[in-house]
């Protein structure tokens, strides 16, 4: 079998640098690391999950603040370093495994991570696709472009909309690529995710809502009445517009989470179940 060429094949690495096959960029700025932990606002009552622990720069600080730290790392060399650095911290467990193959904690947990850019979307899906999980809040460092897509007021994607029905997602601040080793080609962002105390929908409706969101956001720039005409009758749509207090030109991509809740509740109350749109199954990295 012919070997597949990799973008790092033949690249000369700096001293101490490991091949970065997952898109992992390690933070080395101590003030930035302390800021991340401070903004996470964790206590000894918290179980903290760190995804992509690297050499433990963030892990060691988390170990001093949290009740329990679960540090996930797949690189064997990094795992050895992590094990040595956290040897004195009995509250810290090193999980030597692929991030996408782990089982999330059953208890309530917090995520504080500088995640590998290459698997940003799969990680977000893992954390947010099940609103009934124990995930409560997080501070996650990710590629700036992804952060902007997840937080944009104009919503184009059904997954992002569904996540934001149950979680608040916002950019805390941008981070220069100079704070990482090896430095990425683009800047990063610190993102805060918080579970909504009063979500507009029950988490049991997640799959059904995803179906509605996926159907409606096929063309996010078109008017709502056009996007949903396959679901609602003209009479139902007229009633819905009055409930939403919008005109005929309101586009689906500009609706708020609360307006989407009204649309979903109207559908479940007045539309026959067989007319409800179904969500398509996608691969973990697709969005």
Curated annotation (Swiss-Prot):
Region of interest (Disordered), residue spans: 1-21
Family matches, as Pfam families: RrnaAD (PF00398)
Gene Ontology BP terms: response to antibiotic
Keyword RNA-binding in record: yes
Induction: By erythromycin and oleandomycin.
Binding site for S-adenosyl-L-methionine: 25, 27, 52, 73, 98, 114
Biased composition (Basic residues): 1-13
Record's keyword terms, sorted: Antibiotic resistance, Methyltransferase, RNA-binding, S-adenosyl-L-methionine, Transferase
EC code(s) of this entry: 2.1.1.-
InterPro entries: KsgA/Erm, rRNA_Ade_diMease-like_C, rRNA_Ade_Mease_Trfase_CS, rRNA_Ade_methylase_Trfase_N, SAM-dependent_MTases_sf
UniProt superkingdom: Bacteria
GO MF assignments: RNA binding; rRNA (adenine-N6,N6-)-dimethyltransferase activity
Disulfide bonds: none
Similarity field: Belongs to the class I-like SAM-binding methyltransferase superfamily. rRNA adenine N(6)-methyltransferase family.
Function: Involved in erythromycin resistance.
PANTHER family in alphabetical order: DIMETHYLADENOSINE TRANSFERASE, DIMETHYLADENOSINE TRANSFERASE-RELATED
Protein's name in the database: rRNA adenine N-6-methyltransferase
